[in-house]
């Protein structure tokens, strides 16, 4: 996984390993797609990293997001795991990662279960996970699950040495 476009502020670049830490720590991602008409579209999604790929879900397959990915599977997901506005300095401390790749609908039942589990473990760990897994089993057929094969991954941060400790 490499960066395909040069980063302007190389001094703020973080390693691929640290970009994965950002992804695993973020509460959500923003998925960017482009429709067949060339119009961009971005929407928040619950995403999870598992075995080198990203998974996210939607409530139904017929949506602008799904139509865009069917027409053009190239997507980008932006994750922000930390942000703190520093008004007096006219800046923001942040930790972010951008993953670019191709999105494909997951149809294999074993992979669908794996994806649901990864999403539940990422976003509902602890005492709530059983409730969410039961929901996934009950409602799983009505949810569209997508896999993103990562083609490039980059991360960027202002104040990474301090933020890194806070991410764990």
Give the location of each predicted region.
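Charged, gly/pro-rich active-site loop segments
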Residues: 2-11, 82-168
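Short, basic/aromatic recognition patches
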Residues: 2-30
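A generic structural signal for nonpolar/aromatic side chains embedded in well-ordered alpha-helices
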Residues: 23, 68-69, 119
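Short beta-strand segments
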Residues: 26-61, 77-78
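A generic structural signal for short beta-strands and their flanking turns/coil linkers
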Residues: 27, 43, 50-52, 71-75, ...
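Helix-adjacent hinge/juxtasegments
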Residues: 64-88, 92
């Amino acid at each position: 996984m490499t960066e395909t476009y040069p980063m302007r502020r190389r001094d703020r670049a973080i390693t691929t390993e640290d970009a994965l830490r950002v992804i695993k720590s973020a509460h959500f991602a923003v998925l960017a797609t482009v429709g067949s008409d060339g119009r961009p579209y971005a929407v928040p999604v619950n995403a999870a990293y598992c075995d080198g790929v990203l998974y996210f879900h939607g409530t139904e397959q017929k949506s602008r997001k799904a139509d865009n990915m069917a027409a053009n599977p190239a997507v980008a997901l932006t994750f922000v795991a930390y942000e703190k506005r520093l008004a007096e300095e006219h800046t923001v401390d942040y930790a972010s990662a951008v993953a670019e790749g191709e999105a494909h609908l997951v149809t294999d039942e074993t992979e669908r279960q794996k994806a649901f589990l990864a999403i539940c473990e990422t976003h509902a760990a602890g005492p709530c996970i059983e409730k969410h897994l039961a929901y996934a089993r009950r409602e799983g057929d009505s949810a569209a699950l997508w896999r993103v094969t990562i083609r490039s991954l980059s991360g960027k941060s202002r104040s990474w040495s301090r933020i890194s400790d806070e991410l764990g």
